Structure formats: structure tokens, C-alpha cells
């Protein structure tokens, strides 16, 4: 009956207004796109509570166990010296477990980030179960198609999605935490856009 308990818990969460729910917005920096052969370089997250981004509760962690940075430093500025001062993936997952328990996980391109996290959890025998999963990329894709607009190439990048809501452009070099913040800002803009009489249920984000 565990599946039924989980289903009911998810249903309850979906009925909440976004401002009533606790969310955790997360981003990863990676060495590549395939969790079977590439690695998590860094993890950044911050909560949204009562409809506000809690920047003071933000966390940023670098994985000291990365074995091959490849071209990663070009994109996020993390080099071997920075990695050496990081933390083990097990430590990072333990921190994430504490931060994410009882919250809705939000990512931009959720299948990518959640896929890498699940691979890391399997490797380190850790289980983290968010209350619900929300993907700002999938939400934006749905909104564009519902409005009858064509889906242009690169229309769903984080930068392109932010631009549609008049949010400022990101710096050319950014990290997991700055991207998590950018995703949190995007989510709140999306919520405002789809709200009716200022109200939006979590179900409308999934």
C-alpha cells in the first residue's frame, strides 16, 4: 500500500497553492550529458517558501571526487584546484537529503538533473524522495504550445525562457547556484503568468 500512500501525498501537495508549498530549486554543473559516463561537478540549491526565494538559505557544493573535468572549466570556471577543496558526493547528498525532505524539487530540464542525481544516489546507496517534481522547461514548453506559437530552436534554454518574462540576462560565466537562482526567478514569473486572481496551485506546474 506504500504506492497508495505516496500517491495520496502527491495529490495533497498538488492541491496546495504555490505560496503554501515548500520548494527547493536545484541546478547541477556536469562534465557531460550522460550520467553513465559523466560526472556531477557542482550542485547549487535554494528554497522557495511562502512564494519568496530564500537566498539566505542557498547552498553551493563542489564535488571533490570528479575525475575528468574535460571542457567544464570553460563553462563554469571550476578548475582542478577548486575541485580539490570540495566535498565528497556522499556528503553533498546528505546535505541535499536534509534540504529536500518534505519539499517539491524544481529544476530546469528536470530529466537531466534528476537523472544524474539518481545515478549518484544509486552509487552511494542514498534515497531522496521529493514530494513532487517540477520542470520549468517542460512548463514553458507547454505554455508556448498552448498559446499556439511554434517552438523555435533554443526556445527553451534557461536564458530564452527568462527573456520571455523580461528577466535580466545571465552573466556569460555562471555556476550551479546562480543557475538555481535564475530558475527560481523563472518559476515565480511563470507562476505569476498562469495565476488566476493571483492564485496558482502546484498541480498547474506539473
PLM region spans:
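Acidic two-metal-ion nuclease catalytic site recognized across multiple nuclease folds
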Residues: 1-15, 164, 184-206
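Short alpha-helix plus adjacent loop in nuclease-associated cores
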Residues: 134-152
Amino acid at each position: 500500500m506504500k504506492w497508495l500512500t505516496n500517491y495520496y501525498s502527491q495529490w495533497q501537495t498538488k492541491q496546495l497553492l504555490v505560496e503554501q508549498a515548500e520548494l527547493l530549486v536545484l541546478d547541477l554543473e556536469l562534465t557531460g550529458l550522460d550520467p553513465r559516463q559523466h560526472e556531477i561537478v557542482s550542485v547549487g540549491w535554494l528554497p522557495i517558501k511562502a512564494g519568496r526565494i530564500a537566498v539566505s538559505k542557498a547552498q553551493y557544493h563542489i564535488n571533490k571526487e570528479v575525475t575528468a573535468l574535460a571542457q567544464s572549466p570553460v563553462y563554469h570556471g571550476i578548475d582542478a584546484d577548486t575541485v580539490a577543496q570540495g566535498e565528497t558526493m556522499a556528503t553533498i547528498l546528505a546535505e541535499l537529503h536534509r534540504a529536500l525532505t518534505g519539499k517539491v524539487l524544481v529544476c530546469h530540464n528536470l530529466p537531466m538533473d534528476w537523472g544524474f542525481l539518481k545515478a549518484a544516489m544509486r552509487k552511494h546507496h542514498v534515497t531522496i524522495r521529493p514530494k513532487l517534481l517540477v520542470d520549468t522547461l517542460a512548463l514553458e514548453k507547454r505554455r508556448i504550445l498552448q498559446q499556439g506559437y511554434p517552438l523555435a530552436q533554443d526556445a527553451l534554454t534557461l536564458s530564452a525562457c527568462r527573456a520571455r518574462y523580461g528577466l535580466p540576462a545571465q552573466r556569460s560565466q555562471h555556476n550551479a547556484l546562480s543557475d538555481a537562482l535564475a530558475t527560481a526567478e523563472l518559476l515565480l514569473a511563470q507562476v505569476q503568468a498562469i495565476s488566476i486572481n493571483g492564485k496558482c496551485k502546484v498541480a498547474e506546474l506539473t
